[in-house]
Design a protein with these regions (language model features):
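Short secondary-structure transition/capping segments
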Residues: 4, 106-109, 220-224
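Sec-dependent bacterial lipoprotein signal peptides
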Residues: 1-25
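Central regulatory/effector-binding core of bacterial HTH transcription factors
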Residues: 69-83
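Short beta-strand and adjacent tight-turn residues that come in two discontinuous sequence segments
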Residues: 77, 95-98, 103, 191, ...
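Short, conserved beta-strand segments within well-ordered enzyme catalytic domains
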Residues: 47, 73, 92-95
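Pocket-flanking alpha-helical
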Residues: 80-111
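Exported/periplasmic ABC-transporter solute-binding proteins
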Residues: 27-68, 87, 119-124, 129-311
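Periplasmic N-terminal soluble interaction domains immediately after the signal peptide in Gram-negative
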Residues: 113-117
Length: 311
């Protein structure tokens, strides 16, 4: 009888202990959230404006070399598609040419109960490229505006990385044409920035519009090959001297070059995840140096401007 009682109590205690272990394990797993990535490990997809592909490829390459357990998969697309991905929750991080508007901030605050983080990490320039055989490589903004809206009657045409939804198109409509429309007989589209470069290389009297990171880095062998096919045009300076300037870093930093825009990240992440880790990386020294070496101008750190030449 005593043996049965002892055995019964032991069985009951074992059941309680097993239940406690299961309960503790469940709580511990919830607190640690092992299913989630951290700031330096895991895998995430990010959506990136295609005009920044060369420099963001460089950022990811260095980040993953520093953190071998981290994998960042960049999907390059138009800026409008990046914002659509953010709304649809198909990505938690995008890299584009603007931050959130007040209306967008309110939308995310209402739907997420927290504000997404965003910040400008670099300044970029929209470069104008021409065929090596073209005699003219100096343009006023009035001349460029006239080519885009067809008011000059000139034989020159323009090519962009798409006819809608790209950041370069938005910049041209908002900042050059001031809301007016393109002349459809004068403006054509390629699928991406590389297509723009190749089109200009094979056609005379065409102005191509691309982000400077596609053709500014002479340490990149592929970009050196581009510069054998096309030339970077000089645009009328915003300064009072009336000179013409190319998108050198000094001209980007001082806004002497007339077509400067920002590079922003927008992050929809409310824990210390891989998106935040990558955002911190491109914000601080190593990432800022990569922007510098890619001939953009860093927005978060001060650097000495060195002499550089773009063909």
């Amino acid at each position: 009888m005593i043996v049965k009682l002892i055995n019964g109590r032991m069985n009951w205690m074992l059941m309680v202990a097993a239940f406690a272990v299961i309960l503790f394990s469940g709580c511990s797993g919830h607190n640690e959230r092992p299913d989630l990535d951290s700031s330096n490990r895991g895998t995430i997809h990010i959506s990136v404006d295609e005009s920044f592909k060369p420099v963001i490829d460089s950022q990811i390459q260095v980040f993953e070399a520093l953190y071998p357990k981290a994998k960042i998969i960049a999907d390059y697309k138009s800026e409008a598609e990046c914002f659509k991905d953010l709304i649809k929750d198909s990505t938690r991080m995008i890299i584009v040419t603007r931050g959130l508007t007040d209306e967008e901030e309110k939308f995310y605050k209402d739907s997420l109960t927290f504000y997404p983080a965003f910040d400008k990490v670099a300044n970029d320039a929209v470069a104008v490229i021409v065929n090596n055989s073209d005699p003219d490589s100096l343009f006023s903004m009035d001349k460029i505006r006239g080519i885009l809206d067809g008011s000059t009657g000139d034989k020159q045409t323009a090519v962009f990385d798409g006819l809608r939804e790209t950041s370069t198109i938005r910049f041209a409509i908002d900042s050059i044409l001031k809301g007016k429309s393109f002349d459809p007989k004068k403006v054509f589209a390629e699928k991406n920035s590389l297509g723009v470069i190749n089109y200009v290389a094979n056609h005379k009297n065409v102005l191509g519009f691309v982000g400077v990171s596609w053709i500014g880095n002479k340490e990149d062998t592929s970009q050196l090959s581009f510069l054998k096919k096309v030339r970077i045009a000089a645009l009328e300076c915003t300064c009072p001297e009336g000179t013409f300037v190319k998108p050198y870093q000094a001209n980007i930093e001082r806004r002497r070059y007339p077509m400067v825009r920002g590079l922003y990240y927008i992050l929809k992440e409310n824990y210390n995840g891989l998106g935040g880790g990558f955002a911190n990386f491109i914000t601080y020294e190593k990432g800022q140096l990569i922007f510098m070496r890619s001939y953009l101008w860093p927005a978060k750190m001060n650097f000495t401007i060195r002499s550089a030449t773009l063909n």
